[in-house]
Amino acid sequence: MLENAFIMLAIIFSVNVIYVSLMTVRMILTLKGRTYIAAFVSMFEIVIYVVGLGLVLDNLDQIQNLVAYAIGFGTGLVIGAKIEEKLALGYITVNVVSANPDLKFTQRLREKGYGVTSWSSYGREGDRLSVQILTPRKYELRLYETIQEIDPKAFIISYEPKRIHGGFWVKQVRKGKLMNPKKKKNTNTVESENEQK
């Protein structure tokens, strides 16, 4: 009897972890505009939800089942968030302000395959170089490391753009083929492609 009770708790906990993980991922996919994938995930999500809820409702007199359900819910949220971090869907825009306008910031970032826009700006203590970079979220940490290598004192702020329209990278972004900074094309190849256009 006790063994069956533990099995029931484990099933309720596991079902809810899976359900909430899928729910979290589905919500994030929806927010990122991946509607069809989100709809596909939701089919599995609702089946698991009904099974888990049914197990709890059939045994409402057992408080431990409700506790397992609640703990599974919280655990599922954490796991869902971790899955989203690993998937790193979408893009980020990083704005960088360097106190040293003479640094070859733009050139070095472009050599690594990033889409870069730069302009001269003026801060409290004089001239600045402002740089805006668009990159897939999965390359975010690598970009920060590159920026720190170029200018350890650079001011960095990042945000997630809601819409991307126009500009050099739009076709690649729409196809999900924004260049991987790790696998940068050979400069000669890029130049020859530009000449052909």
Curated annotation (Swiss-Prot):
TM spans (from-to): 5-25, 37-57, 63-83
Bilayer topology annotation: Multi-pass membrane protein
Keywords on record: Cell membrane, Membrane, Transmembrane, Transmembrane helix
Primary site of residence: membrane
Species name: Oceanobacillus iheyensis (strain DSM 14371 / CIP 107618 / JCM 11309 / KCTC 3954 / HTE831)
Any one GO CC term of the record: plasma membrane
CDD domains: YitT_C_like_1
Name of the protein in question: UPF0316 protein OB0738
PANTHER family, per the entry: UPF0316 PROTEIN YEBE (PTHR40060:SF1)
Pfam families noted in UniProt: DUF2179, DUF5698
